[in-house]
Amino acid sequence: MATLEDSFLADLDELSDNEAELDENDGDVGKEEEDVDMDMADLETLNYDDLDNVSKLQKSQRYADIMHKVEEALGKDSDGAEKGTVLEDDPEYKLIVDCNQLSVDIENEIVIVHNFIKDKYKLKFQELESLVHHPIDYACVVKKIGNETDLALVDLADLLPSAIIMVVSVTALTTKGSALPEDVLQKVLEACDRALDLDSARKKVLEFVESKMGSIAPNLSAIVGSAVAAKLMGTAGGLSALAKMPACNVQVLGHKRKNLAGFSSATSQSRVGYLEQTEIYQSTPPGLQARAGRLVAAKSTLAARVDATRGDPLGISGKAFREEIRKKIEKWQEPPPARQPKPLPVPDSEPKKRRGGRRLRKMKERYQVTDMRKLANRMAFGTPEESSLGDGLGEGYGMLGQAGSNRLRVSSVPSKLKINAKVAKKLKERQYAGGATTSGLTSSLAFTPVQGIELCNPQQALGLGSGTQSTYFSESGTFSKLKKI
């Protein structure tokens, strides 16, 4: 009898046979599996305790070359972009594009270093990462605190707001962390220094891009300013990428979650990024800032497209867009027009009410008060009325069901509804005469003093014996004489 171990081994043999057949039939799949195995091997050999294995951007040749060019460009003044050249062929624009890509890489590298610091420092103060979200602020706070257990001895006033400092101090008293070993603490401090160096390099790159915005993107700079234009280009990945981006995405570029430390978020601005730092947005009343942000984003996208095609190197279009934005915001702030007094209607201009007619009579007949309702609404003097619940409770019935004078009160027909005598006579004749038909009360026997009972023609009274009947068989009639031809 086979054991459980033998059955497992048999299943593994079958799986190995199937894998061999698949490798023979499809060689590409085998290559992909080898690549995956290589990647997994690299991940296994990666040492997360070593900062150099995690963060490699600062030691790359591309980082060193771009930073060297940026420092040289900041040290000397430049006249701007060369006139008459295509934007993509301009060496200064190429450097700006490289700086934009490098700024994105620096942002990603800061996030990697931030995660490294959090993984190491959570043994000391795990709750700090939920209180301080920004990577640079977190690195500064960690470098300031170190292995200190009493935060009252640490001055964080120049790093965090007073409300956040109070929350951090209270949370540090209840944390379950312990002091870090000396080697781990040195790695954490080194990571903090690297994060700060990356942040200073990013600021230097943005400063260079900002200084060149007047020549590279004059229209965009005229709307949002050079600093915001540089940040937008750096986040989007260049002027061409920014020109292809829709306005709804430009509006949220640079938007970050704000740490309110338990306070209400009802008054915080949502879905606003770098455009919040523009002069137009800051000078707009709070109730109109959301609309102003959408308008600035739309016009900034148009200005970026003009700059990408080098359509207006002087920035006239950008100034026109800015003036249009200003006029629209002023128009929004204007009070609504005063309510005009309503003029009086012209005398006798209203249509007269219809007081008669067939439709109105039918409607009055349909909604007139019935006889039962009239009796229910009428009460006899000195006679109590009956009620639905008895003893005068409930709905009263009035004179319904009471013995009266045994005389039926019939309402007279209104004079307007009566027909005249002539019309009534004609209706009566139609009813009994029936036209040419003989009435059932008419008899063909007549009593005369000469012969007694004799037959008579009942149609003689109607004058039907006329025409040929009166002359053809008449005693006084003569024969017709025909004249021969």
Swiss-Prot record:
GO MF term set: RNA binding
Residue spans of biased composition, Basic residues class: 352-361
InterPro entries in UniProt: Nop_C (IPR042239), Nop_dom (IPR002687), Nop_dom_sf (IPR036070), NOSIC (IPR012976), Prp31 (IPR027105), Prp31_C (IPR019175)
Main location group: nucleus
Residue ranges constituting the Nop domain according to the UniProt record: 216-334
Keyword set, alphabetical order: mRNA processing, mRNA splicing, Nucleus, Ribonucleoprotein, RNA-binding, Spliceosome, Stress response
Highest taxon above the source species: Eukaryota
Sequence segments annotated as region (Disordered): 1-36, 329-361
Compositional bias segments (type: Pro residues): 334-348
Record's keyword annotation contains Membrane: no
Disulfide bridge positions per record: none
Motif Nuclear localization signal: chain residues: 352-365
Comp. bias regions, Acidic residues: 11-36
Mutant lacking the gene: phenotype: Developmental defects, semi-dwarf phenotype and reduced growth.
A GO CC annotation given for this chain: nucleus
Subcellular locations according to the entry: Nucleus; Nucleus, Cajal body
Keyword Disulfide bond assigned: no
GO BP: cellular response to cold; DNA methylation-dependent constitutive heterochromatin formation; response to cold; RNA splicing; seed germination; spliceosomal tri-snRNP complex assembly
Biological function: Involved in pre-mRNA splicing. Required for the assembly of the U4/U5/U6 tri-snRNP complex, one of the building blocks of the spliceosome. Functions in association with STA1 and ZOP1 in spliceosome dynamics and pre-mRNA splicing. Required for transcriptional regulation and pre-mRNA splicing of cold-responsive genes, such as LTI78/RD29A, KIN2/COR6.6 or COR15A, especially under cold stress. May play a role in stress response. Involved in transcriptional gene silencing of endogenous transposable elements, independently of the RNA-directed DNA methylation (RdDM) pathway.
Family to which the UniProt record says this protein belongs: Belongs to the PRP31 family.
Subunit details: Component of the U4/U6-U5 tri-snRNP complex composed of the U4, U6 and U5 snRNAs and pre-mRNA-splicing factors. Interacts with STA1 and SOP1.
Stated name of the protein: U4/U6 small nuclear ribonucleoprotein Prp31 homolog
Native source organism of the sequence: Arabidopsis thaliana (Mouse-ear cress)
Gene name in the database record: PRP31
